[in-house]
């Protein structure tokens, strides 16, 4: 949230600043207020397609500006816990990074090709996904001793 939109070779310094953190500078109450619609317009100036790999906290900075012309696909990484699919934060964060690597290594530009992602035990779930939300389930191997 602090740096805005970054390019592949942009340098950053490690920091921990959440989007909803109070921001007394520039008359803004938080980073959502500071960035306003600028992040959305930067993302959509050349293409109206957005693949959302961000956490819910960061997604909020874009979603409220979406229009009907935008193609917005949210990626969800989850696993079965009891009889429910749940997102486990640490694994989801690892999977988001791994998906970016997968897309870069395979020069992926078509959203359909993202469905081939199969790293870290995740597989695309056709039955749970839609045109706007791609669900990837992590299969956990249960080892008995």
Report residues per predicted region.
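Internal, well-folded beta-alpha domain core
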Residues: 1-130, 135-145
């Amino acid at each position: 949230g602090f740096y805005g939109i970054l390019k592949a070779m942009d340098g950053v310094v490690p920091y921990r600043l959440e989007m909803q953190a109070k921001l007394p500078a520039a008359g803004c109450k938080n980073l959502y207020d500071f960035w306003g619609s600028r992040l959305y317009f930067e993302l959509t100036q050349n293409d109206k397609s957005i693949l959302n790999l961000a956490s819910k906290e960061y997604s909020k900075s874009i979603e409220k500006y979406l229009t009907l012309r935008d193609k917005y696909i949210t990626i969800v990484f989850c696993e079965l816990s009891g009889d429910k699919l749940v997102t486990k934060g640490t694994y989801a964060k690892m999977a988001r990074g791994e998906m970016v690597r997968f897309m870069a290594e395979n020069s992926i530009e078509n959203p359909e090709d993202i469905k081939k992602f199969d790293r870290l035990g995740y597989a695309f779930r056709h039955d749970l996904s839609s045109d706007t939300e791609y669900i990837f389930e992590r299969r956990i191997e249960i080892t008995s001793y």
